[in-house]
């Protein structure tokens, strides 16, 4: 069963990277503090953009940033689809807005959006979008991801294990931290 063992080891590495990604996002969220709730007035796309613009204005005012300073926005991966389907409904045209259309809207607001996995996942078998859309917003360069040397070992054999025909198939570790810069 070498193919099965290889597939499982590969999937273990992917799962490990997802867990690290979740920890990095959680560290950023913790550093940013408690989120501000925004009472929406209507459609998902306009409410989301308005909430982010208000948050962005507050950040620009607090740090006295240029009005054209790029702000980083982190949202769950499914947020793009929420925005696209809402724009489709609002525009009343027969074509679905593209990823570029959504990016252009945020680009016009000087926001660089990252759609991420491993944070605020959709419940299994969802039939409706969540009622709230969490977002992290901060000036570009506010956080640095720190890493240390990585050790990956595979197929490690030792004398005691050889006697009973076992080996270490996979061992990995990674040192990761998030440092706030401002």
What are these regions (language model features)?
Residues 1-42, 170:
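Long, contiguous amphipathic alpha-helices that act as assembly "spine/axial" helices in icosahedral shell
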Residues 18-25, 65, 115, 119:
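Intrinsically disordered or highly flexible coil/loop and linker segments, enriched in small
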Residues 4, 44, 94-102, 121-122, ...:
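Alpha-helix capping and helix-coil boundary motifs
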Residues 36-107:
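Extended, solvent-exposed, turn-rich assembly/linker loops in the middle of proteins
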């Amino acid at each position: 069963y070498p193919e099965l063992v290889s597939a499982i080891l590969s999937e273990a590495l992917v799962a490990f990277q997802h867990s690290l990604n979740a920890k990095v996002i959680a560290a950023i969220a913790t550093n940013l503090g408690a989120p501000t709730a925004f009472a929406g007035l209507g459609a998902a796309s306009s409410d989301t953009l308005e909430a982010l613009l208000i948050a962005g204005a507050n950040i620009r005012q607090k740090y006295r940033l240029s009005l054209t300073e790029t702000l980083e926005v982190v949202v769950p991966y499914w947020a793009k689809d929420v925005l696209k389907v809402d724009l489709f409904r609002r525009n009343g045209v027969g074509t679905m807005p593209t990823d570029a259309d959504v990016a252009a809207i945020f680009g016009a607001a000087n926001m660089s959006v990252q759609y991420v996995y491993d944070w605020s996942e959709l419940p299994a078998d969802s039939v409706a979008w969540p009622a709230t859309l969490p977002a992290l917003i901060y000036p570009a360069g506010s956080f640095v991801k720190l890493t240390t040397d990585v050790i990956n070992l595979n197929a490690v054999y030792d004398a005691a294990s050889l006697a009973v025909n076992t080996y270490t198939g996979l061992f990995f570790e990674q040192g990761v931290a998030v440092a706030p810069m401002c």
